Amino acid sequence: LNALRHRPHIIIGTPGRLLDLYNQEAFKLSNLSLFVIDEADQVYSTGQSEEVNQLRNAIQGVQTICLSATKNAKIHTYFDTPFEEIFQGEIAVNEKITSYYLETDNKKDTLPSLLHTLPITSAIVFVNHRSTAIELSDLLLRNNILSSAFSGYFDERKRIAIMSDFRKGDIRVLVATDAAARGIDIHELSHVIHYDIPIDTETFIHRSGRTA
C-alpha cells in the first residue's frame, strides 16, 4: 500500500486483489495508458473474468493487451469490439526437447526408479491434485531424492521459499500442481514429467514449456 501511494509507473497484481485495492481507492486509474492481461486464456476460463471486466469498465478507452502462449476462443466473447491479434502463429515444436511416453502398471513405484536413472539436473513432476503432490514428495524423500510439493493452495511465503530452494538446487525435484505450469522461469530445468495427464492440451503446452 505504501508503494501505491508513491504513484508507481506499473502496478502488477491478481485481478481480485487489484479490484479490491481500487475499490478501497488505494490507487486511481484516471491516468492509465495501458492495461495488460497476462495468461489471458486462463483468466477468461476461470472465475477471474468478472474482476477483470470490472476493472476494464473503469478504464474505458484504454488499450488492452492480452498475452498468452495458447489461445482460447472464449476471450473474444468478453470484448465488445474485435481486437487485433498482433502476433498469431502455430505452436512450433522445440527441437531441443525430447519427449518419451512410458507405460507402467504402477507409476508410483516407477517414479523414484526413473528419477534415479535419468541424468536430471532438476525436474518438475506435474500432478493434478495437491494431495498427490504431497504424497509423491514424501515418497521421493523416502527414496533419498530431494523434493518438495508445490501447490497454489500453499500460502505465498511458503511458495516463495520452495521456489527459492528449487532455484538454488536445494530441491532437486518439484512435485507440483498446475500452479507451477505458467509464468515460472526455472533455469537449468532438465526434465518435466507429466505424472498425471493434464485435462487439456493448453495445460500440457504450458507444463512442457517450463523447460524452455
Regions found by a protein language model. Name each.
Residues 1-212:
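Conserved helicase RecA-like core
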